[in-house]
């Protein structure tokens, strides 16, 4: 069995001698020899840089949500305006991350389109593994962003539920105003009241009673209007929460439909490829059958000719 010899040192000596013969100084020779030990980091492609940038943005969004989680959910830590500003910042983060992912998807599609040659066939420089790797990177980023968005949807649903609970109408018992007529006072002071005042007093009491009845009716009407306004506000908040949940589910269904469409397109391509291979197999089978028939026919005539010749 032959032995293997390590020629690394001989190679380094040859490189050092070549560098000295070319005219390298000591610093250049040292940097050249150091390159064998410490390799330069490979330069990242634009796609990889954009993917890492998107991942950093998603991580930053997750940290922002974790930092302001209590401020957004707690009822008494922040005001509604501050919660709305937090929600707007998170929405801007999500929109920016989604745009970055769309840019990555468009770059993959452009690369696939440019890699196709004549008649839509793959060119020589087409790398299917690289394309598949990039699709996997985009899928991982999309799932990461979707998980962070789902967490924020849970926080938003909690906030909406708290708003609904606070906006529920609290019915207060209606106070019945009972007016005590000053009978005793009237009776007590009847001796000192003049006859004209005695005749005008029932009229005043009647007017006062009418005013009290109108005031009570207005209070009841205003209370009913307030209850109706609170119910309308509650329904509007519920509709807003339902609209948001519906938009989230519609987005998820759109992603699922797009994924199913891609799978259907891929399945159609596989079926077409299978049909081509099946037709080729049928042609090969028919040609082999013809060859066997011709072979047996020639063999039969050869045997008959040999028998006749002998």
From Swiss-Prot:
Subunit organization: Part of the t-SNARE complex. Interacts with MAG2.
Membrane topology, from the record: Single-pass type IV membrane protein
Role of this protein: Vesicle trafficking protein that functions in the secretory pathway.
Cytoplasmic side: 1-289
Compartments in which it is found: Membrane
Gene Ontology CC, one term: membrane
Protein name: Syntaxin-81
Assigned keywords, A-Z: Coiled coil, Membrane, Protein transport, Transmembrane, Transmembrane helix, Transport
Record InterPro entries: SNARE, Syntaxin-18_N
Broad class of the protein's primary localization: membrane
GO biological process, one term: vesicle-mediated transport
Cystine crosslinks: none
Coiled-coil annotated residue ranges, if any: 77-114
Gene: SYP81
Membership in a protein family: Belongs to the syntaxin family.
TM region positions: 290-310
